[in-house]
Amino acid sequence: MAGRNQNRTASLAGIQASGHVHTFGNCTDNDMLEEDAEVYELRSRGKEKVRRSTSRDRLDDIVILTKDIQEGDTLNAVALQYCCTVADIKRVNNLISDQDFFALRSIKIPVKRFSSLTETLHPLKGRQVLHPPPVPYFQEQDTVPANDSPSSSESAGSFLKEVDRDIEQIVKCTDTKKENLNEVVSALTAQQVRFEPDNKSVHRKDPYYGADWGMGWWTAVVIMLIVGIITPVFYLLYYEILAKVDVSHHSTVDSSHLHPGLTPPSHHREMGNAIGPTKGIPVGQQDDHRLYRQDPQARD
């Protein structure tokens, strides 16, 4: 037990020397025994290292500019003018409240190293001294365009003249004065038709659809008329003509039976060939038969 207590006291003394464990006067040996004597030193992990490195990089990227405070300047106005936050200005100038700003003659402003402000003001490399020579921002801003004022004014004047010419041409091209409403409507419709091809893409019609064999609606209508009207009409006419021919044939046959003296042209042909019209009897014998039929009483 004595050796174990000596080892624990030695380890605790080493820990106290490192500054990680604080002992209190009320602590006893029993309390120290209950607690875990093995205490390890915590090391910073990757995220904390990255945070520290990023914070250092941010501090290195910041450049401090000084500006003389003039009448009408406020803390918010300076922050808006130099694109920074009020908290950053307070932190750099050790300001507790906004009222402390009015007690200063010059103010330090944190600005990023690579920005438009650093390019225009030409600050010193790195951080400046606590009291550097003041840089008149407004005077330099006035002097920079003063060197190029003639060329800039000439270019601006020429640009404005060109704009005026373009406006005059547009006004001449678009004459809005119309005498009648019809002219207004025609002008608006012409403009609408002019702008329609730009907005709408022209879809090319495919002449072959597959199901209708590439036929249009008018060809379908013509086919329906032919099938539904013209074909039945021709059919009826054909059968009417056939019926008339049959009726005329039957009428000629009936007339030949009713009037035996009238011989049809076929009988005349048979007589010309010396053949009887009925049973192939010669003409002389036919006369004898006629005489026999005409005088039956004479024979009696």
Curated annotation (Swiss-Prot):
SMART domains: LysM (SM00257). Residues 140-156 have a biased composition (Polar residues). Residues 286-300 have a biased composition (Basic and acidic residues). GO terms for cellular component: Golgi apparatus; Golgi membrane; plasma membrane. The modification Phosphoserine is found at S55. One of its GO terms (molecular function) is peptidoglycan binding. Residues 65-109 form the LysM domain. Residues 238-300 are cytoplasmic. Glycans are attached at N7, N26, N199. The chain crosses the membrane at residues 217-237. Gene3D superfamilies: LysM domain. It comes from the Eukaryota. Residues 1-216 are extracellular. Its main location: membrane. Residues 136-157, 253-300 are annotated as: Disordered. InterPro entries: LYSM1-4, LysM_dom, LysM_dom_sf. It is a single-pass membrane protein. Keywords: Cell membrane, Glycoprotein, Golgi apparatus, Membrane, Phosphoprotein, Transmembrane, Transmembrane helix. One of its GO terms (biological process) is Golgi organization. It is found in: Cell membrane; Golgi apparatus. Essential for Golgi structural integrity. PANTHER family: AND PUTATIVE PEPTIDOGLYCAN-BINDING DOMAIN-CONTAINING PROTEIN 3-RELATED (PTHR20932:SF5), LYSM AND PUTATIVE PEPTIDOGLYCAN-BINDING DOMAIN-CONTAINING PROTEIN (PTHR20932). This is LysM and putative peptidoglycan-binding domain-containing protein 3. The gene is Lysmd3.
